[in-house]
Regions:
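Conserved glycine-rich cofactor-binding loop
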Residues: 48, 55-56
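The beta1-alpha1 cofactor-binding region of Rossmann-like NAD(H)/NADP(H)-dependent oxidoreductases
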Residues: 80-81, 100-112, 144
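Substrate-binding pocket helix/loop in short-chain dehydrogenase/reductase
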Residues: 138-139, 143-148
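Residue(s) in the substrate-gating loop at a strand-loop-helix junction
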Residues: 182
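Conserved glycine-rich Rossmann-like NAD(P)H-binding loop of the short-chain dehydrogenase/reductase
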Residues: 71-85
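Active-site helix of classical SDR
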Residues: 162, 198
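SDR active-site lid
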Residues: 215-287, 294-295, 300-311
Length: 351
């Protein structure tokens, strides 16, 4: 009897010791991570920050926040008129800002932009790959060209910019790269298949580079936002029953229960870059969706298929493209989209 009791007690003590060692190990890892984050803390004052797609929406809001932090800014976008309005906006806030017309899908243009920035500022501290396109509609109306455009913008464009800044960052053994992916780069969303496919590619690129570039002193952060009130639906592309597509998309983008104020999102992104975080998922809804998909992939897929049944069927203008501002309906714009509409006015999305 005593032998059995002693054996049972010994096993319990062994289990308790194992839990204590595990807890101590976890505590040590957390402490080491906290120390590492502090060591990576980054000050934006007088640092040169390059932002693609910086003339409107999230890119412009990031530029404003970084200007307030004392950064020197270099922004690029395709539309020179939008760029000039953004330059005036930022200069009025006291920013040291350089603007450059550039299509990120053209490698030569990206290389020239980076060359000009290095010549002007002398060093390249931060690259934020933000430029994006959105095509909304069922897969039946999405063409190969839509997929190619999304990949050129969300994968090849960031890669071109990264390859252009890497030599200077490697030479100094310092630099930050922030890749703006999406919740759509974590979970496939119906009626956004070209967008999601290209954002998945960007997420994979960003995570792989994070692992490889840390040894060179270069910190890569992957950002996966949920819906943000940038005002961008006006300039997104809608296909098929484009008015119905614009209605559901713009309302979802505007409601406080489904989206976040873009200024809050921008501050979170800047904080993640400053701390050198590996990943940032923006909005509680997006974080819950990612965790749920990881834990219950079959159920998550079935729910998304159910959502797809509720979205507009193919038809309408078919594969032709219409911008959001060409797709307005009785409900969009309306009181339901008011917050997004105001954001469009603030963030240079009205052109």
């Amino acid at each position: 009897m005593n032998d059995q009791f002693n054996g049972s007690l010994s096993r319990r003590n062994g289990q308790s010791n194992a839990w204590l060692w595990a807890a101590a190990g976890l505590g040590g890892l957390m402490a080491a991570r906290a120390l590492l984050r502090r060591a990576r803390e980054f000050d934006f004052k007088d640092k040169t920050v390059l932002i693609t797609g910086g003339s409107r929406g999230l890119g412009l809001v990031l530029a404003r926040e970084l200007a307030a932090a004392g950064a020197r800014l270099a922004i690029c976008a395709r539309d020179p008129h939008e760029l000039e309005r953004a330059r005036a906006d930022l200069a009025a806030r006291g920013a040291d800002v350089h603007v450059f017309p550039c299509d990120v899908t053209e490698r030569a243009q990206v290389a020239e932009w980076v060359r000009v920035c290095q010549h002007r500022f002398g060093r390249l501290d931060v690259l934020i790959n933000n430029a994006g396109v959105i095509e909304v509609g069922p897969v039946e109306v999405q063409t190969l060209a839509d997929f190619e455009e999304a990949m050129r913008t969300h994968f090849w464009g960031p890669l071109y910019a990264i390859l252009a800044v890497l030599p200077e960052m490697r030479r100094r053994r310092a630099g930050r790269i922030v890749n703006i992916s999406s919740i759509g780069g974590r979970i496939g969303v119906p009626h956004l298949v070209p967008y999601c496919a290209s954002k998945f590619a960007l997420t994979g690129l960003s995570e792989g580079l994070r692992a490889e570039l840390l040894k060179d002193g270069i910190v890569v952060t992957t950002v996966c936002p949920g819906l943000m009130r940038t005002g961008s639906p006006r300039n997104a592309i809608f296909k098929g029953r484009h008015r119905a597509e614009y209605t559901w998309f713009s309302i979802s983008d505007a409601l406080p229960v489904t989206s976040i104020q873009v200024e809050r999102a921008a501050r979170q992104i800047i904080a993640a870059c400053k701390s050198g975080d590996a990943e940032l998922i923006i909005t509680t809804q997006a974080l819950v969706a990612v965790k749920f998909n990881a834990l219950f992939p079959e159920l998550s897929a079935d729910l998304r298929a159910l959502v797809n049944q509720l979205l507009p069927a193919p038809g309408g203008i078919g594969a032709r493209r219409a911008k959001g501002k060409e797709s307005e309906s009785a409900l969009a714009p309306s009181l339901l989209t008011a917050l997004s509409d105001k954001a469009a006015e603030r963030n240079n999305e009205m052109s």
